[in-house]
């Protein structure tokens, strides 16, 4: 592992269409989380509900988030948490990491999910997939992820 980069998240945004629309055409990772509900994971509490990604500009962060917002993604967990309280989101533009991450966005998502599992003991509560793909890669970068952001 040659270089460690600390990942800090941008300010939280309200999970609503007027904040989602400007993200059309942007690829990367996005994080949906609660404003006040602490999820008790095995190792610690977090407000993080979901880690997602967009790998193509035609299926951008904006369109993926809109799919979660209007229920088209069929993620019942996110839909039901949103019924209880307004949610927040933040994102990482993949363009910002291209110089230090040599693999696909899918692998970056797997890295983040597996790192969350290591810190909290299980996948984010609304994620339904695993992140095993990255385990077969030889990594030249590692990320120290600021999971405290979601506390």
Which residues make up each language-model segment?
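Boundary/linker segments flanking structured domains
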Residues: 1-151
């Amino acid at each position: 592992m040659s270089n460690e980069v600390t990942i800090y998240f941008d300010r939280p945004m309200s999970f609503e269409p007027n904040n989602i629309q400007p993200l059309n055409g942007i690829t990367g990772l996005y994080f949906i989380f609660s404003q006040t509900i602490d999820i008790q994971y095995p190792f610690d509490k977090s407000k993080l509900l979901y880690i997602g990604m967009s790998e193509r500009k035609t299926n951008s962060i904006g369109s993926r988030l809109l799919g979660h917002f209007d229920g088209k993604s069929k993620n019942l967990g996110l839909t039901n948490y949103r019924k209880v309280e307004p949610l927040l989101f933040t994102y990482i533009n993949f363009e910002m990491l291209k110089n230090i991450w040599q693999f696909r966005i899918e692998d970056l998502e797997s890295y983040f999910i597996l790192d969350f599992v290591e810190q909290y003991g299980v996948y984010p509560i609304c994620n339904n997939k695993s992140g095993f793909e990255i385990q077969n890669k030889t990594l030249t970068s590692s990320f120290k992820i600021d999971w405290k952001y979601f506390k």
